[in-house]
């Protein structure tokens, strides 16, 4: 399973469920849940949403102690494949962007089912990273982002384009399965946040491509193709830096998430 930093989680989950737009979570029936578990909670962004929507006890579980320490919630150090809770404990067991990072998501779901009470709900909020779209004031950015994304999806060790997981829910015996789509929008525009300025500076260095080079190679790119992609990415990044300097850079990224809910 990939490991993430607190800053990465804060950046990638910025704006998720903001503004009270939480209709996609309706099937979790959080208003009637007394005990809720967020598995793979990280630094607690989704846990906080669950706590806002539920009147009951909300617990976050993650195997990374540093992320748990940053989460403003009741936290338990735990592996998603071996949750330290008795059978039939929770009314709702949920996760966000966890199954896409697991080599065997069905194994984790079976644990979710075990610790959920009969009649309780299991939910997974998972992205389809293959369907992410980018709009940018830098002309080359959208096409380059798509090229890098295609290679990343093809080369990743897990199914990062998992999205809706109805088949997995059916396979572990969950009933009344529903799937709702929710879109997360990440916007960069003036006045720029410090994190956005740093992210643009990373583009000019092609830092993300360097860190993911092995995965991109696994996706089918040759060394020459990766070198050319890096060259074009740095050129795009320098133009983005220039636009930030004059206050004209704008970027909009839309990530489709699918909220799959089933009943135990």
Regions found by a protein language model. Give the residues of each.
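A short glycine-rich, Lys/Arg-flanked "PGG" loop and its adjoining helix->strand segment in the class I
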Residues: 106-121
